[in-house]
């Protein structure tokens, strides 16, 4: 059914696509985070900063942790996941907006954490997200799998729920702007395979 979808390990040359897809997966949150670095002269634009971050060799959540889905001759989606080790306990949030997510992550040390799973809008609904999710579950190598999504992201909540993920905890999101829509961050987990 999804034989038209090919998965491959990302390479450094995919950094631009990874930045775009990570931003899509985060519904613009990644761009907001990268904006501060652009304002400080690290890059000209937030997207350029995202590309630089995704091209780093040693950074968790960069190209080395990413799997690309291709369909119909183009990059269609990405999943970025890694083992969440004890080192997360030493990380402190540097801005209030990341504190709730970091606190949730600290409760699932030892799991395989999916930091991003995104598919271009015109290619959604044909199994690409499911295929990327299945691949991440396989990469977990019998560890529990965890992820965080927004409480108002119904498509993501549905996909994860249909694939054995259960809500483990919630934390109110810190609004990015005064008029931002209110939501919570939802930690979802799936038992070890």
What do the PLM-derived regions correspond to, one by one?
Residues 80-116:
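Conserved acyl-donor/pantetheine-binding loop and adjacent beta-alpha core of acyl/acetyltransferases
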Residues 74-77, 155:
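Glycine-rich acetyl-CoA-binding "A-motif" of GNAT/NAT acetyltransferases
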Residues 110-112, 133, 139-152:
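Conserved GNAT acetyl-CoA-binding A-motif
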Residues 143-154, 161-163, 170-193:
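C-terminal "cap" of GNAT-fold acetyltransferases
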Residues 1-16, 24, 28-36, 191-193:
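Conserved N-terminal entry element of GNAT/NAT acetyltransferase domains
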Residues 53-68, 84-89, 113:
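A short helix-loop-beta-strand connector motif used in the catalytic cores of GNAT acetyltransferases and
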Residues 27-54, 65:
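Conserved GNAT-fold acetyl-CoA-binding loop/helix
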Residues 119, 125-138, 158-162:
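Conserved acetyl-CoA-binding loop-helix of GNAT-fold acetyltransferases
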């Amino acid at each position: 059914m999804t034989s038209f979808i090919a998965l491959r390990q990302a390479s450094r040359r995919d950094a631009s696509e990874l930045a775009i897809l990570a931003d899509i997966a985060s519904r613009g949150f990644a761009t907001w985070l990268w904006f501060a670095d652009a304002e400080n002269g690290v890059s000209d634009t937030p997207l350029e900063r995202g590309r630089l971050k995704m091209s780093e060799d040693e950074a968790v959540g960069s190209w080395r942790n990413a799997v690309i889905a291709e369909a119909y001759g183009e990059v269609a989606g990405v999943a970025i996941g890694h083992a969440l080790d004890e080192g997360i306990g030493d990380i402190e949030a540097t801005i209030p907006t990341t504190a709730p997510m970091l606190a949730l992550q600290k409760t699932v040390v030892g799991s395989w954490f999916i930091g991003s799973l995104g598919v271009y809008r015109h290619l959604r609904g044909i199994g690409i997200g499911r295929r990327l999710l299945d691949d991440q579950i396989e990469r977990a190598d019998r560890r529990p799998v965890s992820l965080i999504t927004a409480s108002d992201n119904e498509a993501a909540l549905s996909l994860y729920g249909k694939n054995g993920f259960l809500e483990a905890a919630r934390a109110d999101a810190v609004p990015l702007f005064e008029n931002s829509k209110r939501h919570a961050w939802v930690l979802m987990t799936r038992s070890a395979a």
